[in-house]
A protein has these predicted regions:
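Carboxylate-rich helix-loop segments that flank metal/cofactor sites and access channels
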Residues: 92-112
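Active-site oxyanion-binding pockets that recognize sulfate/phosphate
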Residues: 63, 121-122, 148
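Acidic/Ser/Thr-rich, low-complexity mid-to-C-terminal regulatory regions of eukaryotic proteins
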Residues: 105-130, 136
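Catalytic cores of carbohydrate-active enzymes
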Residues: 81-93, 97, 130-172
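Amphipathic alpha-helical interaction segments
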Residues: 56, 115, 139-140
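A generic structural motif
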Residues: 7-9, 123, 138, 145
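Aromatic-rich carbohydrate-recognition surfaces in CAZymes
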Residues: 1-99, 125-128, 132
Length: 172
């Protein structure tokens, strides 16, 4: 968004997101890569995609965002909610758990001898912040468009996630 939307390059953003949409579709449907996006399997990639779409909604319009990316948002959120991601596990408290013991999975991705220098496993704060944001944004956007079933389910999950986030992560 910073390289496109921030300078009114909406068409370029949409072009990039079309490539991302294809890659995300292939990934979540376990289909051969029609388009290759580096590290698509990492736990935060789909959540960052939702954040990018949220920036589009802010800069362009929520209605246009829902029309253009509503189905993609639904697909991403259902994929994560149903625990289909190979390295994101939705726990009963609403938080996402990821395993980074064998492979670096966050921005702290330095490796030595093929293993993470800083293995990050468990409830990773930035992943869960993105998750909570994705739940709230998608719930609101879908509700505005009349998709209340999924919107309500995401909102209930967001309530649970928000409470667990505050209980789990120290904020001093």
């Amino acid at each position: 968004p910073g390289l496109t939307l921030a300078i009114d390059e909406v068409a370029k953003f949409e072009m990039v997101m079309e490539t991302a949409r294809k890659a995300i579709h292939d990934f979540i449907n376990d289909e051969p890569d029609d388009v290759k996006v580096y590290e698509m399997e990492h736990p935060d990639v789909l959540l960052w995609a939702v954040w990018c779409i949220q920036q589009y909604a802010k800069m362009v319009s929520r209605d246009q965002c829902r029309e253009k990316y509503g189905t993609l948002l639904q697909d991403i959120m259902e994929y994560l909610r149903r625990e289909n991601h190979p390295n994101l596990f939705l726990h009963s408290n609403g938080l996402l758990y990821a395993n980074g013991t064998e492979k670096a999975i966050t921005w702290m991705n330095s490796t030595a001898n093929g293993r993470p220098v800083i293995p990050r496993t468990g409830y990773i704060v930035e992943i869960n912040a993105l998750w909570y944001n994705a739940l709230r944004f998608t719930s609101e956007l879908l509700s505005e468009g009349g998709n209340n079933n999924l919107a309500d389910a995401l909102n209930v999950l967001a309530e649970k996630t928000g409470k667990a986030f505050v209980d789990t992560f120290l904020n001093e």
